[in-house]
Amino acid sequence: MSAAFLRVGLDAPADLLPELTELYAGCLELRLVQPDAAAVAFEVGETVLEFRPAGGAPFYHFALLVPGDRFEAALAWADDRVELLPDPETDEVVFDFTSWDAKAAYFHDPAGSIVELIAHRGVGEGGASGAFEAAELLGLSEVGLVCDPPAAAEALRHELGLELWDGTVEGEARLAFVGEKARTLILCRAGRPWLPTGRPAEAHPVEVMLAGGPDGVVLLDGGGRVSRRATGDGPTVRASPSPRHDVRGG
């Protein structure tokens, strides 16, 4: 099945929903598709990115997919709107992932999530030129799931046929990349530092609806347990906190 993200639902402090709306709809000019008191949602290419009010201070890592031939234009677009996060070792804001033939940049949103802009050479290239626009974003490229990677990887393989395509589920400091290039679930243990800030990963609820696959919703919690409920919308992966250095920095 495809690992394309149709909808990604994240928790956010209720008092930050206006600031998130200002960033994503105002500064980044994403289309606001769900402006109500219960949640806010934005159109990012093929993906709807939703923030739902919750307690605590949840934060996440996710990536916005840029056409492979538009990274420099997207970088200038982002630099005009947000503060890009530098590599603490080089002070550069562009991260070159040569093994993936990809380039990326990062910024924080008001909830503290680590948001990435990433372009994979050869993916979504349409030959556009000129100033970059939000409408060129292809969708979400990555969603971090803070979980037990071996159990989660097995559940995703068994229930959805999603395979590990890079990284490994072994080792406390490693990441596992499941799905396919440019549409990836990143499996990460709690406490493992996220690139580029080094902030330790924390498990917070996340729901991901994937394109394709059999009817039904697959619910995956942080412990790797899977259940299914009937729906016509497509499979959903849901991660929640469990009770009990990598190929790419993440």
Each PLM stretch: what is its role?
Residues 95-100:
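Short loop/turn motifs at secondary-structure junctions and domain boundaries
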Residues 1-6, 10-34, 43-90, 101, ...:
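Glyoxalase I/VOC metalloenzyme domain signal
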Residues 36-38:
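Ser/Thr- and Asn-enriched, surface-exposed coil loops between beta-strands
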